[in-house]
A protein has these predicted regions:
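Gly/Ala-rich beta-loop-alpha elbow adjacent to hydrolase catalytic centers
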Residues: 54-67
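Acidic catalytic loop of the alpha/beta-hydrolase fold
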Residues: 102-107, 131-132
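Active-site nucleophile loop of the alpha/beta-hydrolase fold
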Residues: 14-15, 80-88, 101-103
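Serine-hydrolase catalytic machinery in alpha/beta-hydrolase-like enzymes
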Residues: 1-50
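Short beta-strand/loop motif that positions the catalytic acidic residue
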Residues: 98-100, 104, 112
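A conserved short beta-strand
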Residues: 73-86, 94-95
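Catalytic histidine-centered segment of alpha/beta-hydrolase-like enzymes
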Residues: 22, 129-144
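Catalytic active-site module of serine/aspartate enzymes centered on a nucleophile-bearing elbow/loop
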Residues: 36-43, 137-159
Length: 159
């Protein structure tokens, strides 16, 4: 979708991150810091100031990384956050769109709802969807993905 709209794509590869981070604040912070460092090494080569618009698209712990990188580097960016973890809201700002499933074991829906309300962020909640935005019903999941991509495209187009 982003490429179709003329965005240049810079994919960030995190490398190896700690395992079994869910429920372990120390490991989660370690994973975040490592992912942020990997991102910094790759993204610092980009001259963001030459672009009319910067769009970060992220998922899971990557939502915290994208928000923190943009904030730390004073990049005026728009953000698409797919299934943020609870810790992401420590750095997520007021510019973006959020997608969350009510069966996501990484963060309670009420937390996501409250944090999005505080920031006036559009939030799209999918009932019974997990951290991968899947419900276990393939046909339903395809429809869910189609809806998510429609909302994503609408956000990209609303410059």
């Amino acid at each position: 979708l982003a490429m179709e709209r003329g965005y240049e794509i810079a994919e960030v590869k995190y490398g190896e991150l700690p395992a079994n981070v869910k429920g372990n604040a120390k490991k989660m912070l370690e994973a975040f810091n490592k992912a942020l460092q990997y991102s910094k090494e790759q993204l610092d080569k980009i001259e963001f100031n030459v672009y009319d618009e910067v769009l970060f698209i992220s998922k899971s712990v990557g939502t915290a990384v994208a928000a923190a990188y943009a904030k730390n580097n004073k990049i005026n960016s728009r953000q698409i956050y797919y299934t943020p973890v609870a810790e992401s809201f420590e750095v997520i700002g007021e510019n973006g769109i959020v997608f969350h499933g009510t069966a996501d074991p990484w963060v309670d829906t009420d937390i996501v709802r409250n944090e999005c309300e505080k920031r006036n962020l559009p939030l799209y909640i999918t009932e019974s969807a997990n951290h991968s935005m899947e419900t276990g019903n393939v046909e339903k999941d395809i429809v869910i993905m189609e809806e998510i991509m429609k909302k994503t495209a609408e956000y990209m187009d609303a410059k």
